[in-house]
Curated annotation (Swiss-Prot):
Gene source species: Homo sapiens (Human)
One cellular component (GO) term of this entry: nucleoplasm
GO molecular-function terms, A-Z: RNA binding
Name the record gives this protein: RNA-binding motif protein, X-linked 2
CDD domains, per the entry: RRM_ist3_like
Residues carrying Phosphothreonine: T140
Region (Disordered): 134-322
Compositional bias ranges of the Basic residues kind: 155-171, 289-308
Family: Belongs to the IST3 family.
SUPFAM superfamilies reported for this sequence: RNA-binding domain, RBD (SSF54928)
Record keywords, A-Z: Isopeptide bond, mRNA processing, mRNA splicing, Nucleus, Phosphoprotein, RNA-binding, Spliceosome, Ubl conjugation
Signal peptide range in chain numbering: none
């Protein structure tokens, strides 16, 4: 069968499995689960083992390689065999590298069920023998050696942790001693500042209360005359307004005292205003009475003068007699 047709058939199989969602156990790759070798065909003749490892090591670590060469000339025949460390990398290599092109040549990749190393002849070099026997992959350490090295590492780490903890404890003790030595010297000025703050606190509070009381008094004084004009006899309404104007933060006792004082002030002012109005009314009445009496006297005098003139005009003979 033509190698290109084999490439097409393998790709068609992979596509069908992907479309149908076939499980790994039922896949055609499961037939080669015991072999980690793959076959590479159609390689360019110029490629060496190193070039092949660089290309095909993308999906796993390569442990062994066998590039078939001509015994006389030493040139490659265009195909080789690869061995991966993990068998699952062979599945990835067959699915992805099958049908790729390197230097214009399509490459065929397929599984190998039972790979047998070629019979060694006397002409083979020592290097090729070592490669075929030991492989070209990195050696993994044995489990016993790895466990012993892991046991040694925690012991070393534990010792280092103990030393670091001791150093940290010493540093903390030194820092605590320095802080304790600094505390008595620094505590005295702090206490003084706290006392000064406590002393200034009530002073500020009292000054604020006095300022608020002073502000409330002129406001009350400004609003009193308006209340007089609006309410002639409304002492009770004034008291209500004054109670509303008082701040909420004042105590009940102080508010009651101020209300009583304001009541007495309002009463005194009402009395003085009544007396002033009565005095003014009496004075105006006296003036009107006087003006009336004066007008009466003037009219009476004019009448007398007229009468006397009439008498004189009526009796001129009496004047000459006298």
């Amino acid at each position: 069968m033509n190698p290109l047709t084999k490439v097409k058939l393998i790709n068609e199989l992979n596509e069908r499995e992907v479309q149908l969602g076939v499980a790994d156990k039922v896949s055609w790759h499961s037939e080669y689960k015991d072999s980690a070798w793959i076959f590479l065909g159609g390689l360019p003749y110029e490629l060496t083992e190193g070039d092949i490892i660089c290309v095909f090591s993308q999906y796993g670590e390569i442990v062994n390689i066998n590039l078939v060469r001509d015994k006389k000339t030493g040139k490659s025949k265009g195909f080789c065999f690869l061995c991966y460390e993990d068998q699952r990398s062979t599945i990835l290599a067959v699915d992805n590298f099958n049908g790729i092109k390197i230097k214009g040549r399509t490459i065929r990749v397929d599984h190998v069920s039972n790979y047998r190393a070629p019979k060694d002849s006397e002409e083979i070099d020592d290097v090729t023998r070592q490669l075929q026997e030991k492989g070209c992959g990195a050696r993994t350490p044995s489990p016993s050696l790895s466990e012993s090295s892991e046991d040694e590492k925690p012991t070393k780490k534990h010792k280092k942790d103990k030393k670091e903890k001791k150093k940290k404890k010493k540093e903390k003790e030194k820092a605590d001693r320095e802080v304790q030595a600094e505390q008595p010297s620094s505590s005295s000025p702090r206490r003084k500042t706290v006392k000064e703050k406590d002393d200034t606190g009530p002073k500020k509070h009292s000054s604020k209360n006095s300022e608020r009381a002073q502000k409330s008094e002129p406001r009350e004084g400004q609003k009193l005359p308006k209340s007089r004009t609006a309410y002639s006899g409304g002492a009770e309404d004034l008291e209500r307004e004054l109670k509303k104007e008082k701040p909420k933060h004042e105590h009940k006792s102080s508010s009651r005292r101020e209300a009583r004082e304001e009541k007495t002030r309002i009463r005194d002012r009402g009395r003085s205003s009544d007396a002033h109005s009565s005095w003014y009314n009496g004075r105006s009445e006296g003036r009107s009475y006087r003006s009336r009496s004066r007008s009466r006297d003037k009219s009476h005098r004019h009448k007398r003068a007229r009468r006397s003139r009439e008498r004189e005009s009526s009796n001129p003979s009496d004047r000459w007699r006298h």
